[in-house]
C-alpha cells in the first residue's frame, strides 16, 4: 500500500501502463454499458410491444387463412359428396323406402334414435327396403363423418323430411322454424353448397353450423331430388384457433360474429352464467388495446367474409404478459451490462500485464545491445501482436549488428579475391581476342568471295571448339546457296525452252483462229441471205394461207346459200301441193255446184211459168260452175308443170351442193397444207435467226480467242525475255564442281497444228 500511495498525487495520464489501461477500460465499459442499458430500458418496452403486435397480426392472418382453407375444403367435400353416383343411388332408394314406411313406425324409430342414437326400425315387408338402404348409408357415412370431424350428416327428401342422419336427429318432418329447415330453404336456389352461421357456443354445449347442398335426381339432372346437410361443431373452430401461438402463456385467438358473440371458446374470459360479448372496437380490423372479459388485452383483428357471413378473427395477448415481457427484457439488459463491466475489468488487467511485462524485457535487451552485447537472446518474436512486432524490430537491430561485424571481415577477403580474379580475366580476354581475330579473318574471306559470286570456296581452316559451329553453319549455308543457284539456273533454262514452245503454239493458234473468224464471217453472210429467203417464203406462205382461208369461207357461204335454195324449193313444192289440194277442192265444189244447178233446172221446168226465173239463175250457176271447173283444171295443169320443174331444179341444186361441198373439202385440205407450210417456214425462219445469232456469237468468241492468243503470244515473249535475263544473271556466279551456268541451247521448236 505504501508503494502505491504516491499515485494518488499524480495525474492519471502519467500513470504506468499497468494501471492506466485497466482504469481507462473500466471507465469506458461502465460508461458504454450505462448508456446502452438506459437506451435499452427506454426502447425495450416499445420494441417488445411492436414485436408482439406484429406477431399478433401474423397470428390473426394465419388463423383467418387456416379457417378459410378449412371452410373451402369442407365446401368442396360436401359438393363432391352430393354428386357421388353411389350416394345419389342410395338416396333415391332410401327416399322410395321412406315413402313406404308408416308414420307410426317413423315416430317409434325417431324416439329410439333420439334416446340411444341408434336406428332400430324393425325390418317388415314394408320397411325392409328402407332399413336396408339406411344401413348401407350408415356403413358409409358414419366413418366418413368421424374421419372429417363432422357433427353429423343428414339427408332430406324433396318434401324437406329427414330420411337419414348419422347423429341423434329424428327422421321425419322437421320444425318449420328450425335451423335444418332454414338451411334447406337457403340452398333452394343455389347450385353450390350454402352454409349457415355458427350458433354461439357455451361451456356446456358447442355451437353448430350446417352446410346444405341440393341432391339432383339420378335420371333427371335438372330436378332437385333432396338435400344433403353436413353439421359442423364449433369444436372445429376451437381446434383451428387452438393452433395459435403467442408470446405469453395466456395468448389466444378467437372468432367473433358481427353480433359481437364469440364463435369459439376463450380461455381469457370464461363466464358460464353471463353471455360473453366481444367489445365492438375489437371487431374492427387493426391492432388496438381494449378490455376483454375482466382483463386489458392487446389485440389484432382480421375480417373474414364467407358467403353471407362476416366474422372477426381476433388474436389476444393480455397486457400483463406484454409488460412482463418488457420487464424481463430490461432485467436481462441490466444483467448483461454488469457482466460486461466485470469482464471488461478482468480483461483490462490481463491486457495491461501482457503489455507491461514484455515491455520491461525489451527495455533490458535494448540496453545490452547499446552496450555492444550482440549475443543477447530476444524473447517474444513469435507473438502476433504489437509486442511481437517490437520484439522482431529489436531482433533486427541485433542481427544488423552481427551482420555489420561479419560484413567487415567479408569485405577484406573479397577485396583480395577480386584482385586475383582480375589478373586471370585479363589473360583469358587477350587469348580470346586473338582467336576471334583469326576466325573473323576466315569468315571475312569467305564472305568476300561470296560477294564476288564465287560459291566454291568453303572454309577449310580448323576453328577453336567454340567457333566450330560457326564454320559448319557457314559452309552448310554456302553449299545450300550453291545448290539453289544451280536449281534456279536449270529451272530458268527449262522455263525458257517451254516458253518458246508455248509462244510457237500460240502463234499458230492465233493464225488458225484468224482463219476461222474469216470463215465464220462468210458463214454469217450466207446465213443472212438464207434467213432473208426463208422469211420471204414464210411471208408468201402466210399470204397464201390467208387467201385459202378466204376461199374456204366463200365455199362455206355458197354451201349455206345452196342449202337455203334447196329449203326454198322444198317450201315451193309444199306450197304447190297445198294449191293442188285447194284446186281439187274447187273442182269438187264446181262439180257439186253443176249438179245442184242441173237439179234446180229440172225442178224449175217442173214448176212451169213460176220457175222460169229460177231456171235462168240455175243456168247461170251451171255456166259459172263449168268455168270454175275449167279454170281449176288449167291451174292444176300449171301446178303439175311447176312441180316437175321444181323437182328438176332441186336435183340440180343438190348436185351443185355436193360439188360445192367437195370443193370446200379440197379447199380445207389446201388450207391445212398451206398453214403447215406457213408454220414450217416461220419455224425455219426462227431457227435460222437463232442459228444466225449463234454463228454471230461464235464469230465474236473466235475474234476474242484470236485477241487472247495474240496477248498470250506477247506474254510468252515477255516471259522468255525475263528467263533469258535470269540466265544472264546466274552466269555471273561461279559454282565450282565442273558445273556451268551458261545458257543451254534451246531445243528444236515444236510446231503445233490445229485440225480444221
Curated annotation (Swiss-Prot):
InterPro entries: Chemotax_Me-accpt_rcpt, HAMP_dom, MCP_chemotaxis, MCPsignal_dom. It comes from Sinorhizobium fredii (strain NBRC 101917 / NGR234). Residues 491-720 form the Methyl-accepting transducer domain. GO terms for molecular function: transmembrane signaling receptor activity. The chain crosses the membrane at residues 26-46, 330-350. SUPFAM superfamilies: HAMP domain-like, Methyl-accepting chemotaxis protein (MCP) signaling domain. Residues 353-406, 434-486 form the HAMP domain. Keywords: Cell membrane, Chemotaxis, Membrane, Methylation, Plasmid, Repeat, Transducer, Transmembrane, Transmembrane helix. One of its GO terms (biological process) is signal transduction. It is a multi-pass membrane protein. It is found in: Cell membrane. GO terms for cellular component: plasma membrane. SMART domains: HAMP, MA. Signal peptide: none annotated. This is Probable chemoreceptor y4sI.
Amino acid at each position: 500500500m505504501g508503494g502505491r500511495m504516491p499515485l494518488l498525487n499524480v495525474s492519471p495520464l502519467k500513470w504506468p501502463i499497468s494501471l492506466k489501461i485497466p482504469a481507462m477500460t473500466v471507465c469506458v465499459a461502465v460508461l458504454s454499458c450505462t448508456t446502452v442499458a438506459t437506451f435499452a430500458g427506454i426502447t425495450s418496452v416499445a420494441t417488445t410491444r411492436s414485436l408482439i403486435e406484429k406477431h399478433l397480426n401474423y397470428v390473426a392472418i394465419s388463423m383467418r387463412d387456416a379457417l378459410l382453407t378449412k371452410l373451402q375444403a369442407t365446401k368442396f367435400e360436401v359438393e363432391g359428396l352430393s354428386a357421388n353416383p353411389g350416394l345419389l343411388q342410395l338416396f333415391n332408394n332410401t327416399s322410395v323406402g321412406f315413402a313406404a314406411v308408416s308414420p307410426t313406425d317413423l315416430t317409434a324409430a325417431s324416439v329410439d334414435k333420439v334416446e340411444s342414437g341408434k336406428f332400430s326400425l324393425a325390418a317388415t315387408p314394408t320397411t325392409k327396403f328402407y332399413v336396408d338402404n339406411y344401413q348401407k348409408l350408415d356403413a358409409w357415412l358414419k366413418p366418413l363423418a368421424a374421419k372429417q370431424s363432422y357433427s353429423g350428416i343428414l339427408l332430406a327428401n324433396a318434401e324437406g323430411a329427414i330420411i337419414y342422419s348419422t347423429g341423434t336427429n329424428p327422421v321425419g318432418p322437421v320444425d318449420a322454424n328450425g335451423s335444418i329447415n332454414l338451411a334447406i330453404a337457403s340452398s333452394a336456389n343455389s347450385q353450390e353448397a350454402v352454409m349457415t352461421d355458427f350458433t354461439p357456443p357455451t361451456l356446456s354445449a358447442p355451437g353448430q353450423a350446417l352446410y346444405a347442398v341440393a341432391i339432383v335426381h339420378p335420371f333427371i339432372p335438372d330436378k332437385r331430388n333432396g338435400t344433403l346437410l353436413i353439421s359442423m361443431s364449433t369444436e372445429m373452430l376451437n381446434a383451428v384457433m387452438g393452433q395459435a401461438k403467442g408470446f405469453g402463456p395466456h395468448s389466444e385467438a378467437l372468432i367473433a360474429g358481427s353480433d359481437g358473440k364469440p364463435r369459439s371458446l376463450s380461455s381469457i374470459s370464461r363466464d358460464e352464467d353471463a353471455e360473453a360479448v366481444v367489445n365492438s372496437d375489437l371487431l374492427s380490423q387493426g391492432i388496438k388495446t381494449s378490455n376483454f372479459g375482466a382483463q386489458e388485452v392487446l389485440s389484432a383483428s382480421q375480417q373474414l367474409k364467407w358467403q353471407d357471413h362476416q366474422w372477426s378473427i381476433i388474436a389476444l395477448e393480455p397486457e400483463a404478459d406484454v409488460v412482463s415481457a418488457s420487464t424481463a427484457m430490461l432485467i436481462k439488459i441490466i444483467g448483461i451490462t454488469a457482466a460486461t463491466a466485470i469482464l471488461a475489468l478482468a480483461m483490462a488487467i490481463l491486457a495491461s500485464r501482457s503489455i507491461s511485462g514484455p515491455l520491461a524485457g525489451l527495455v533490458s535487451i535494448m540496453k545490452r545491445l547499446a552496450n555492444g552485447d550482440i549475443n543477447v537472446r530476444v524473447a517474444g518474436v513469435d507473438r502476433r501482436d504489437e509486442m511481437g512486432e517490437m520484439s522482431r524490430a529489436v531482433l533486427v537491430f541485433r542481427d544488423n549488428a552481427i551482420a555489420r561485424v561479419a560484413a567487415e571481415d567479408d569485405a577484406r577477403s573479397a577485396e583480395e579475391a577480386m584482385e586475383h580474379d582480375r589478373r586471370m580475366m585479363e589473360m583469358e580476354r587477350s587469348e580470346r581476342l586473338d582467336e576471334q581475330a583469326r576466325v573473323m579473318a576466315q569468315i571475312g574471306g569467305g564472305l568476300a568471295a561470296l560477294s564476288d559470286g564465287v560459291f566454291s570456296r568453303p572454309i577449310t581452316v580448323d576453328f577453336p571448339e567454340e567457333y566450330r559451329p560457326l564454320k559448319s553453319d557457314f559452309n552448310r549455308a554456302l553449299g545450300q546457296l550453291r545448290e539453289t543457284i544451280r536449281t534456279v539456273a536449270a529451272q530458268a533454262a527449262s522455263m525458257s525452252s517451254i516458253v518458246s514452245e508455248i509462244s510457237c503454239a500460240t502463234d499458230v493458234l492465233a493464225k488458225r483462229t484468224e482463219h476461222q473468224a474469216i470463215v465464220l464471217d462468210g458463214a454469217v453472210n450466207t446465213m443472212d441471205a438464207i434467213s432473208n429467203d426463208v422469211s420471204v417464203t414464210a411471208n408468201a406462205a402466210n399470204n397464201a394461207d390467208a387467201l385459202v382461208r378466204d376461199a374456204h369461207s366463200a365455199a362455206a357461204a355458197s354451201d349455206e346459200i345452196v342449202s337455203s335454195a334447196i329449203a326454198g324449193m322444198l317450201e315451193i313444192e309444199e306450197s304447190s301441193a297445198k294449191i293442188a289440194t285447194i284446186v281439187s277442192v274447187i273442182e269438187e265444189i264446181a262439180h257439186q255446184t253443176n249438179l245442184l244447178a242441173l237439179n234446180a233446172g229440172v225442178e224449175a221446168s217442173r214448176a212451169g211459168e213460176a220457175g222460169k226465173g229460177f231456171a235462168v239463175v240455175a243456168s247461170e250457176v251451171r255456166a259459172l260452175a263449168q268455168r270454175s271447173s275449167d279454170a281449176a283444171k288449167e291451174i292444176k295443169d300449171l301446178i303439175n308443170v311447176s312441180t316437175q320443174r321444181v323437182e328438176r331444179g332441186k336435183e340440180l341444186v343438190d348436185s351443185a351442193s355436193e360439188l360445192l361441198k367437195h370443193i370446200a373439202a379440197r379447199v380445207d385440205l389446201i388450207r391445212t397444207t398451206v398453214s403447215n407450210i406457213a408454220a414450217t417456214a416461220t419455224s425455219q425462219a426462227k431457227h435460222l435467226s437463232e442459228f444466225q445469232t449463234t454463228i454471230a456469237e461464235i464469230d465474236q468468241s473466235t475474234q476474242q480467242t484470236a485477241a487472247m492468243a495474240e496477248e498470250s503470244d506477247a506474254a510468252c515473249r515477255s516471259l522468255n525475255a525475263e528467263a533469258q535475263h535470269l540466265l544472264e544473271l546466274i552466269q555471273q556466279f561461279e559454282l565450282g564442281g565442273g558445273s556451268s551456268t551458261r545458257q543451254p541451247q534451246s531445243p528444236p521448236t515444236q510446231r503445233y497444228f490445229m485440225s480444221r
